[in-house]
């Protein structure tokens, strides 16, 4: 379950996202997927423990995830990309990359796609 207190259908949708992203039941997660970093081409799963900022916020190189050299910074329960993190951190006044901040960001993305009312 997400940590945010929200409508039960929104909570269920967030759970579905976490399952589909492979984070909810990730073999290393210690926090329901909120601590999962995208697995790179090397196949080594990884988690993070510092929620003060997005794991890729301070210059950590993105992970190569295929043989074409494509890279990802996907992190957290909903595999949120660093590319969008600074914008949403400011817009939503998110203090950190904690589970609550990740939930709030995910709900904002759903809202922006016009799907929030459909989920309720």
Placement of each model-derived feature along the sequence:
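Cell-wall polysaccharide-cleaving catalytic domain and substrate-binding groove, primarily
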Residues: 1-95, 104-119
């Amino acid at each position: 379950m997400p940590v945010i207190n929200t409508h039960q259908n929104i909570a269920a949708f967030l759970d579905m996202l976490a399952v589909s992203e492979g984070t909810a039941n990730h073999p290393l997660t210690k926090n329901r997927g909120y601590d999962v970093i995208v697995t790179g081409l090397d196949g080594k799963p990884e988690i993070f423990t510092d929620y003060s900022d997005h794991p890729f916020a301070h210059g950590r190189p993105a992970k190569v995830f295929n043989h074409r050299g494509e890279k990802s910074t996907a992190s957290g329960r909903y595999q949120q990309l660093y590319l969008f993190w600074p914008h949403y951190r400011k817009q939503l006044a998110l203090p950190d990359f904690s589970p609550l901040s990740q939930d709030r960001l995910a709900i904002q993305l759903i809202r922006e796609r016009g799907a929030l009312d459909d989920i309720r």
